[in-house]
Amino acid sequence: MADVCVVHLVWAPLGPAALQRFVASYRARPAGAEHRLIVVWKGFGDPGPGADHLAALDGIAHEALHYDLPTLDLPAYGWCAETLDAGALCFLNSESTVLADGWLAALLEPLRDPGVGATGATGSYESPRSIIPFRRRRWPAFPNPHLRTNAFAVSRDLMRELRWPTVRTKPAAWELESGRDGFTRQVWGRGLQTLVVGRDGRPYAPAEWHRSATFRSGAQANLLVADNRTRQWDEADADLRARLSRMAWGADPEAAAAQAPSGGSGGPTRASGA
């Protein structure tokens, strides 16, 4: 039995097209590492996925799980970590498509370093924090480095250690991804690094993310796994691209990178609320 599970979440409201896009990319791009593909049917209820969904997986070796709790993706991933028997897990959301041969091997390789807790295809400095006091307590100020959880890899043991509360709204999901006690900050709190991995196979520390050409920069030419947000940037006009890039990296990305906490080695290098 392979010690790595690739977990692809299939969300019922998206219909079969998203799964068909993922499967086409999965067939075309060898993962580069032995694994088991786990398809999580989310929100299908009884009687489960229809013929078009099932047909998309014809000829693809996979195992199926069913998740029908009314939560967003991250609690479902936490449930998968409890359910599956594997040493490492790679999670790909419903909108994901893989873009390069060896994509899984690239995400897994940095995890061989005991100082690395998680890798992802993209990261951002964005913070939704505002002047509202309650929100200020929930999110660090910009720059707020965090892995985007559209595509990420982590050991099962670490995944099971982390807190995965039941979240049912987009703001709560953003907080679990990028908030003060979100995924990245929980990993940092254990003294571990979070790295973005590019199509070039190179891992990038948070201070390098804006130069990695993976998310809303550098024509995204080094992107390993695409999703709806990377496609949004690809398809945007120049004005919208500029706005989206500022949201991710600020008006001066180099200055933001110099101020950004980096995690690992005991956690952030500056106070998260500074």
Task: Identify the function of each model-found stretch.
Residues 15-18, 44-52, 128-129:
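Short, charged/polar "capping" segments at the starts of alpha-helices
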Residues 4-18, 40:
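A conserved hydrophobic helix/loop-capping motif in glycosyltransferases and polysaccharide synthases
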Residues 86-97:
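Short beta-strand-to-loop acidic/aromatic patch adjacent to the donor-nucleotide binding site
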Residues 169-274:
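C-terminal catalytic/acceptor-binding lobe
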Residues 45-84:
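Active-site-proximal specificity loops/subdomain of glycosyltransferases
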